[in-house]
């Protein structure tokens, strides 16, 4: 069986388990032990998040949150993706992740969300910038696809600040 994480050069690359963004802000791979804190954050922000996140109704209980994190861990182990908790001052304030990884075509798709009380501080932009840097420089990926609703003005603004260009809408 082939190793799940690899590049075309044969080097074995794996997304890092933790990425420092800047002072007090870092990305930490989601773990089952994060389920309670993450679910509480989802519940606290459910009305706000409902506007743009179609998966929201798939996480209605702590057990479903645990199941989601377990699925993310399996994707990570199989080289299909990675999901990070965005931590600001040690507390989870949202998530950012590679929803899919395609090492053969050197591309990945990113998605994210952040609590309403943490918006407008550049946290998502800085987190995505660090993740892009990791993907390009450490994982040898060349294409970073932002997966966000075109109606989500804040996400479109993040894409603009990161220098992304609109290539199409699916």
Tell where the protein language model's regions lie, with residue ranges.
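Conserved GNAT-fold acetyl-CoA-binding loop/helix
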Residues: 50-70
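Acyl-donor (CoA/ACP) binding surface of acyl/acetyltransferases
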Residues: 1-37, 41-48, 83-170
């Amino acid at each position: 069986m082939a190793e799940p994480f690899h590049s075309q050069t044969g080097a074995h690359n794996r997304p890092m388990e933790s990425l420092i963004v800047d002072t007090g802000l870092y990305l930490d791979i989601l773990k089952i032990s994060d389920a309670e804190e993450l679910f509480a954050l989802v519940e606290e922000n459910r009305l706000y998040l409902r506007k743009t996140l179609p998966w929201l109704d798939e996480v209605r209980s702590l057990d479903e949150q645990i199941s989601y994190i377990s699925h993310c861990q399996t994707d990570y182990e199989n080289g299909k993706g990675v999901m990070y908790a965005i931590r600001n001052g040690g507390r989870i304030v949202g998530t950012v992740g590679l929803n899919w990884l395609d090492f053969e075509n050197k591309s990945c798709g990113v998605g994210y969300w952040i609590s309403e009380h943490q918006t407008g501080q550049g946290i998502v932009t800085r987190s995505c910038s660090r993740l892009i840097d990791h993907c390009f420089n450490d994982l040898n990926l060349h294409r970073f696809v932002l997966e966000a609703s075109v109606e989500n003005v804040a996400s479109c603004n993040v894409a603009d600040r990161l220098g992304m260009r609109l290539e199409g809408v699916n």
